[in-house]
Amino acid sequence: MNDIADRLRQRTFDFALGVIGFCRQLPDSWVERELGKQLLRAGMGVAGNYWSACRGRSDKEFIAKLGVATDEADESVLWLTAFERSGIGPATDGKSLLGEGNELRAILAKSHKTARENRQKKKREARRSRPPAHSPTL
């Protein structure tokens, strides 16, 4: 794994820890519990799916897991925005998490797009380098 991937692994993990800390500070009422569960799943999913992508056994698996991590980051931003706009939860932690969630979402989305493009490029190059199929002669 390279340095960039290692740093992103750490950022996704730190984001997940931030989400845990945020959820622990929520008031103990039904609405906050339900919203907190959704945020917790999505926030942990960013790290879990990115880490899984890094262990991918194939380009296809890497791209799929990276796409899921991107979706989880997007969902985390949704829940954090809902907390911010409704005035639920610790405001300062929510704002910093929202900023980090937006950054992670952008990084993961761009990485996902680049990985898909690179895979398509490899496929095209592989097709071009194959010798033409011989037609049977009768």
Protein language model annotation of sequence segments:
Residues 1-138:
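Amphipathic alpha-helical assembly/interaction segments
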